[in-house]
Swiss-Prot record:
Function: Produced by macrophages, IFN-alpha have antiviral activities. Interferon stimulates the production of two enzymes: a protein kinase and an oligoadenylate synthetase.
Protein name as it appears in the record: Interferon alpha-14
Any GO MF annotation of the entry: type I interferon receptor binding
GN (gene name): IFNA14
Membership in a protein family: Belongs to the alpha/beta interferon family.
Residues in the signal sequence: 1-23
Matching Gene3D superfamilies: 1.20.1250.10
Length: 189
């Protein structure tokens, strides 16, 4: 999908803002961005989830990757970044743009993009801080496979409104897990 010029400019400004800021700060501001993302996802609902019960599917969310206790901070942040990146990719497809209100979708893109930039700055800083920044490739691969299952499901369901509703609810659930991981990381600081 070709992003509108105004949205592209907003993303460039956000990119410059987070690139120029110093340090990793998974602050209350970042938590507020997460809540706004979840609120936007809730507002994007177009049909009742109850009308789509027959389409429910277990996408096998890799919850163990979001437990956060076994990770170094850089590893956990890398997993969070991958989650945001894959969510952005999923919702920026041509089939996705047809399923959602364009204004809400653009706001959603901006929130996700800001979070990705914030997390990227944190990864860069944390890799320099930790002695052995072993990036947990298995965890990142688990997140990618999770999104591959979601994409395959949408294709099998021919991107139906109910399939998108099931996916929207699933992404809200996964974003809630990522929000909880971020809270645990902030408490460690």
């Amino acid at each position: 999908m070709a992003l509108p010029f105004a949205l592209m400019m907003a993303l460039v400004v956000l990119s410059c803002k987070s690139s120029c800021s110093l340090g990793c700060n998974l602050s209350q501001t970042h938590s507020l961005n997460n809540r706004r993302t979840l609120m936007l996802m809730a507002q994007m609902r177009r049909i009742s989830p109850f009308s789509c019960l027959k389409d429910r599917h277990d996408f096998e969310f890799p919850q163990e990757e979001f437990d956060g206790n076994q990770f170094q901070k850089a590893q956990a942040i890398s997993v969070l970044h991958e989650m945001m990146q894959q969510t952005f990719n999923l919702f920026s497809t041509k089939n996705s743009s047809a399923a959602w209100d364009e204004t809400l979708l653009e706001k959603f893109y901006i929130e996700l993009f800001q979070q990705m930039n914030d997390l990227e700055a944190c990864v860069i800083q944390e890799v320099g801080v930790e002695e052995t920044p072993l990036m947990n490739e298995d965890s990142i691969l688990a997140v990618k496979k999770y999104f591959q299952r979601i994409t395959l499901y949408l294709m099998e369901k021919k991107y139906s409104p109910c399939a998108w509703e099931v996916v929207r609810a699933e992404i809200m659930r996964s974003l809630s897990f990522s929000t909880n991981l971020q809270k645990r990381l902030r408490r460690k600081d």
